[in-house]
Amino acid sequence: MSFRDLRNFTEMMRALGYPRHISMENFRTPNFGLVSEVLLWLVKRYEPQTDIPSDIETEQDRVFFIKAIAQFMATKAHIKLNTKKLYQADGYAVKELLKITSVLYNAMKTKGMEGSNVGEEDISKFKFDLGSKIADLKAARQLASEITAKGASLYDLLGKEVELRELRTEAIARPLEINETEKVMRIAIKDLLAQVQKTKDLLNNVASDEANLEAKIEKRKLELERNRKRLQTLQSVRPAFMDEYEKVEEDLQKQYDVYLEKFRNLAYLEQQLEDHHRMEQERFEEAENTLRLMQNKLKEEEKRLLKSGSNDDSDIDIQEDDESDSELEDRRMSKPRTAMEVLMQGRPSKRIVGAMQGGDSDEDEDSEDSEIDMEDDEEDDDDLEDESIALSPAKPSRRIRKPEPLDESDNDF
């Protein structure tokens, strides 16, 4: 950026009717807001009907704005702009802005549109972008607050000017002592020389340190190369224990396979054993339930027979005590041997073996039927309950024979 370019740019913008005053100090530092406003104004001046977004809040928006301006000027005015310099928004952007302003300025001069330009200036004063004005308003408020703070500090400093003037006058009027000044200068020179010597020592140390580091690096490289060769040698040589290791590994794999097979067999056999125990338990419970049902049926049958026997005994005379005892012994001997033969009839694995022993003659049967008393019935009930609890395959069952019709009961007398 040159002073002449900046001056020409400000004069051209003033001649073109730019509403704001552009100072040569505006481009000392990057000022993207001013550059974007100038570019938008120049584009509107070149093509009033164009529509270019003026949002420059984010970095992406600024890049899009610069690209849109450059594309518009390249297609409409055949002016090639450097987008990088425009994005810098400093003195280098002025050269790119001059490309546009020079075209518009030359066109204004050649066609002699001074009068119309004055009218356009008046119109352009009222045509402004509201967004840019809001940004200017924020900047103006910030500047107003800064001006207030600086004005207060300036007022305080001006209040101290009287005292400071006297001190300043005394300092200026006081003669300088040459010896003291030389002493201070010598001290300063010594300090500078010490700093220079220290810097030189550091540079020398840097050179020696660099040589030492290079030697260490070279040594490390040699060690690395040596270790790499050693590693390759070790990898290429087969260890002596590898054959034995592979053999042991194969044996271990075989033992593991055998272990897996035996473990599966053991698990299967345990499952079968559990199933067998469960089936036995179910059979036992079924037999117990069947025995309980048969016991209940036998009790009901005995009660019914006792009731019918008591009714029949009312018509029959009781014989002598010794005969009744002998007949009682014969009746006990004539009972069935086992009770499981009746209870386990539904089970296919059990065979029912038993015999019903009757009397030797009709006379014995008649006497047996007539001599049943209540004591014998109670003993039979007790024996049946004891045998049902034992659940042994050979326990006797008490089957009660129904009394035959007493056709010859009158002949006993």
UniProtKB/Swiss-Prot annotation:
Q: In which tissues is it expressed?
A: Expressed in all tissues tested including heart, kidney, skeletal muscle, eye, liver, ovary, oviduct, testes, lung and brain. Elevated levels in multiciliated cells such as the bronchioles of the lungs, ependymal cells of the brain and cells with a single primary cilia of heart and kidney.
Q: What are the Phosphoserine sites (modified residues) in this protein?
A: S314, S324, S326, S409
Family membership: Belongs to the CLUAP1 family.
Task: Say which species the protein is native to.
Answer: Mus musculus (Mouse)
State the function annotated in the UniProt record. Answer: Required for cilia biogenesis. Appears to function within the multiple intraflagellar transport complex B (IFT-B). Key regulator of hedgehog signaling.
Q: How does it assemble?
A: Interacts with CLU/clusterin. Interacts with UBXN10; the interaction is direct.
Q: What gene name is given for the protein in this entry?
A: Cluap1
Biological process, per Gene Ontology = axoneme assembly; cilium assembly; floor plate formation; heart looping; intraciliary anterograde transport; intraciliary transport; left/right pattern formation; neural tube closure
Which parts of this chain are annotated as the region Disordered?
303-413
Q: Which domain of life is it from?
A: Eukaryota
Matching entries from InterPro entries are given as: Clusterin-associated_protein-1
Pfam family for this entry, one: Cluap1
GO CC terms for this protein? actin cytoskeleton; centrosome; ciliary base; ciliary tip; cilium; intraciliary transport particle A; intraciliary transport particle B; nucleoplasm
By its UniProt entry, which PANTHER family does this protein fall under? CLUSTERIN ASSOCIATED PROTEIN 1, CLUSTERIN-ASSOCIATED PROTEIN 1
Q: Which residues form a coiled coil?
A: 185-308
Extent of Acidic residues compositional bias:
312-328, 360-388
Instruction: Please describe what happens when the gene is knocked out.
Output: E9.5 embryos are still viable but die thereafter. Mutant embryos are runted, have exhibit enlarged pericardial sacs, and defects in neural tube development. There is a complete absence of cilia in E9.5 embryos. Sonic hedgehog (SHH) signaling is severely disrupted with down-regulation of PTCH1 and GLI1.
Indicate yes or no for the key word Phosphoprotein.
yes
- This protein is called Clusterin-associated protein 1
